[in-house]
Amino acid sequence: MEQNTDWNFLFVFVVGIIGILVGTVLFFENKSNSFSSRFLAAFLFSISIVSINFGLTNTPFFLNFPNLWRVAGWVAFCAPAFSFLYVRSVLFPFKKFDNLCMLLFLPAIVYAIILIPLYILPTTEKLVIIERALRDKALISLEPEVMLPQGWGTLARVYYGILITISEFVLLVKWSNRTDKEKDSQDQSVYVWVFLFTTVSSVLCVLLVIEYFFHLSRFMDLTQQILYSLSGIIMFVSIYLLFKPSLLYGLKPSFQGVNIGTSVIKEKKAIHLSQEQKAIYKEKIV
């Protein structure tokens, strides 16, 4: 049994490290320097940290470092927020945070506040909580030590994920209706990628809700299913972008709502002007 647990942790840990490495490349080395790539990197960072954190419950790590117990509990609420911002920035680009962007991180802030009483507990009390959770792995996802009814924290994360994926599908429908007459192969590929990205996330969230209420699986508990779900998303994103890195360049400017039509028309008009008129014309439009 111990050997299986070690292999489970090794798999989750390796996939989590891959997610962090891919996120680092997206954030620092992406030549397109696009806003959307930064959000995708932040999404990968978030789910990789959560995955590794859950994976460490298969080891004695938290017995040696009890003050790190649940330290990343609020990070799980950041992943859906970054996911929505990524989809939105790809389909409808923006260059600065607005009120909606800030509102998306409100659940993470609220849950971080809820976790504060746990964080300030004495080390001896934390060790008792950790030992009990490691003996009964079901308690890891139920979070009885948090100031909420058991399991509400996990449900809140999953429901928030479902709400976000529904919002992402709404964005996909809006973009599809908006550009129905102007699609080309590159933009269609990006659209398919965003659709698959959203679909995979939503399916995994729905499966976790079903498992939470009906306990259909007899082979692994809810915590293990969360681990493998997060690992599956990380692998899907990493492998897909490995074979299709051009998706990081996003949609063409004409499909991103960039107002370039007016400037193009002005440049065409300027071709037919004299040199003196061109100079005056340029001064007016600069």
Language-model segments: residues:
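Hydrophobic transmembrane alpha-helical segments in integral membrane proteins
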Residues: 1-18, 153-158
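Non-cytosolic membrane-interface motifs at loop->transmembrane helix junctions
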Residues: 62-74, 217-227
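Internal transmembrane alpha-helix with an interfacial aromatic "cap," most often the third helix
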Residues: 24, 78-105
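Juxtamembrane "helix-exit" motif on the non-cytosolic side of transmembrane helices
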Residues: 54-63, 116-122, 206-218
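Alpha-helical transmembrane segments of multi-pass integral membrane proteins
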Residues: 30-52, 105, 144-212, 224-233
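The cytoplasmic-loop to transmembrane-helix boundary for the fourth helix
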Residues: 92-121, 128-135, 151, 185-201
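Membrane-proximal linker segments that couple transmembrane helices to downstream signaling/catalytic modules
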Residues: 239-286
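Membrane-interface segments at the starts/ends of alpha-helical transmembrane spans
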Residues: 64-65, 135-154, 219-220
